[in-house]
Amino acid sequence: MYKLVLIRHGESTWNKENRFTGWVDVDLTEQGRNEAYQAGELLKEAGYTFDIAYTSVLKRAIRTLWHVQDKMDLMYLPVVHSWRLNERHYGALSGLNKAETAAKFGDEQVLVWRRSYDTPPPALEPTDERAPFNDPRYAKVPREQLPLTECLKDTVARVLPLWNESIAPAVRAGKQVLIAAHGNSLRALIKYLDGISDSDIVGLNIPNGVPLVYELDENLKPIKHYYLGDQDAIAQAQAAVAKQGKAG
């Protein structure tokens, strides 16, 4: 049996402001930093250790990983930073308040943009300052692979090459792997691992800063998965994530 640990970054400044974030590189709040430290404490107390970690190229995930490593005394851990683990790109919604957007377009439309599998939000114009083309962190990524908007289907297609070419081989080699990423890049991976249908994935909400453990068989198929921590608090956090895109 193999184990894989996933963690969504701690609360970011735009999570706190209920704004669509996507590829915008915002930082953690004080609460977000505390969530990351608490995640590290939970993992340490439960006896976990790691051989390698994967994260995105966005600071809220990177800093979450740092805090986990610090708490676990694993600052020396090899870390792979990949744009493929970035949050889903929210296109022209990037930076907008979710509740205000829902008030303007309706809860149903915003739910489709946030959670449907194959409907992307309106795209950015290529000349928009939020477009990734001139960002140095993507200098080595072919321009045609850089998104101006994404649906979850696009995010799955972006994440899976990293899983197939790097993460899965590391797990099969017996390495203890930690992935610190984002709500939708983790939803994309979980959809693949658990074989969740396109319609059922709408209901999956991942709380900030809570370790999610996957136990996998020899074919890397899930045996079971579970969050570490106070289960009632985790359920409340998941419900709060689900409510973010509603006008009321």
Curated annotation (Swiss-Prot):
Substrate binds at residues 8-15, 21-22, 60, 87-90, 98, 114-115, 183-184. Catalyzes the interconversion of 2-phosphoglycerate and 3-phosphoglycerate. Its EC number is 5.4.2.11. PROSITE patterns: PG_MUTASE. Coiled coil: none annotated. Keywords: Gluconeogenesis, Glycolysis, Isomerase. It comes from Burkholderia orbicola (strain MC0-3). This is 2,3-bisphosphoglycerate-dependent phosphoglycerate mutase. InterPro entries: His_Pase_superF_clade-1, His_PPase_superfam, PG/BPGM_mutase_AS, Phosphogly_mut1. The record marks H182 as: Transition state stabilizer. It catalyses: (2R)-2-phosphoglycerate = (2R)-3-phosphoglycerate. Pathway: Carbohydrate degradation; glycolysis; pyruvate from D-glyceraldehyde 3-phosphate: step 3/5. GO terms for molecular function: phosphoglycerate mutase activity. Homodimer. Belongs to the phosphoglycerate mutase family. BPG-dependent PGAM subfamily. GO terms for biological process: gluconeogenesis; glycolytic process. Gene3D superfamilies: Phosphoglycerate mutase-like (3.40.50.1240). The active site is at H9, E87.
